[in-house]
């Protein structure tokens, strides 16, 4: 323990330090050798030598920090010793040991020169330990020469397999990322959907918004802001992953490998609780083909409808605007697949309800109940081709006008107005779903018009519950100039009868409202 402390703390530690050792700075008046030594250190017998001045020099057992417990003796001329010189251990012969000054003159054999060292920096060859340590650093010119050797520092060597383990871990991370369903996309197709955004902000189901931010012939809005919004990146929008946005969330978050998306007979995805399957329907007039895969519907639009024009730069990604998503139940999905293949399936309904995503503009309690299907205007088409859901607009849609349409039939009911303030009116129109069997939330479009109302809103037959009362329609407060005040009651000529507040042109305190 003592050697460890002396090696770590060096000259700051009192353990092993010389107490009464002579030095050159102390001058000729140094302590005699008969002074008491450290506690626990016993004086050694005097050394016998023919040299008279060296006979009275005893050996002292003083532990110096540089020798790690080795005995420090009175050196005799001709003894083989080791010294630290130039940052390395050198072999030399003792020429003279000045006990009063505490210095030893040593002749270095390899360097062929004579040096004068302190006693702490010299040790005998026969007393050398297996690993002699460097002397402690002293401030001054010699401090640069005596530097600790790196072999005395316990530094663990870096193993060669550590780098390989890092590379292995990096490879495993990259492999896991490449196998993740968030990154997967089939070759030869472009990114069209974002499954992470689809859960909270679904894109239009009739097709993606192109990079120019404009619409196509599908009858939806066109952005007039001029700001282009590129389509979001997607893990290819196969029904396996797009169903997560509209179906119940899965509990399995492990890595899955998607089967070949080019095969139209790919295995059905994991059955969800609501039994809803996402299909893709062609929007080309008089077509209405329904397929399972987004790749198949794109290939169908390119091959049958667009032709060779889709390869040009002008019509690039034009097929994205000619298909939409349709959510069907499991039994109706089989019927749609059979209808696409040309084989009729008995016992299946001919039309399927179109689920419409509910918007969060107003709570459902604040909206009137949807009207019957018979009141809707516009033609309807039988078959699963006619049921098209209305999709939510993308983030590039104009914020001042929200409009959602259900298919090309433009099925809209008579709109009504909700007075919110004298200057802002909210128009809400309902569009019923194509099928009466569907009991989902109806589609509504809300437009805000900032204009003066021509007449108050007519009374509604249906009960309308408005959650927030109109702010600007409080009848308790009288209009400006109608309230009684002293100026109107007494007149200007009888100013002496006014109250003090009216005299100072403040609110009248005598005739309160």
UniProtKB/Swiss-Prot annotation:
Q: What are the BP-aspect GO terms? A: positive regulation of transcription by RNA polymerase II; regulation of DNA-templated transcription; regulation of transcription by RNA polymerase II
Q: Biased composition, Polar residues: where in the chain?
A: 45-55, 348-359
What cellular-component terms does GO give this entry?
A: cytoplasm; cytosol; nuclear speck; nucleoplasm; nucleus
Q: Where in the cell is it found?
A: Cytoplasm; Nucleus
Which domain of life does this protein belong to? Answer: Eukaryota
- Matches recorded under InterPro entries: CR1/CR2-DNA-binding_regulator, DUF4772, Znf_C2H2_type
Q: What is its main location?
A: cytoplasm
The question of whether Ribonucleoprotein is a record keyword is answered with: no
Tissue distribution: Widely expressed.
Q: Give the region (Disordered) as residue ranges.
A: 17-56, 204-269, 335-394
Q: Keywords in UniProt for this one?
A: Cytoplasm, DNA-binding, Metal-binding, Nucleus, Phosphoprotein, Transcription, Transcription regulation, Zinc, Zinc-finger
Zinc fingers (C2H2-type), as residue ranges, are: 280-305
GO MF = cis-regulatory region sequence-specific DNA binding; DNA binding; DNA-binding transcription activator activity, RNA polymerase II-specific; DNA-binding transcription factor activity; RNA polymerase II cis-regulatory region sequence-specific DNA binding; zinc ion binding
- PTM Phosphoserine: list the residues: 248, 376, 449
Q: Does the keyword Nucleus apply?
A: yes
This protein's assembly is summarised as:
Interacts with repression-mediating E2 binding site P2 of human papillomavirus type 8 (HPV8).
**Function in brief:** Plays a role in papillomavirus genes transcription.
Q: What is this protein identified as?
A: Zinc finger protein 395
Its source organism is Homo sapiens (Human)
Gene transcribed to yield this protein: ZNF395
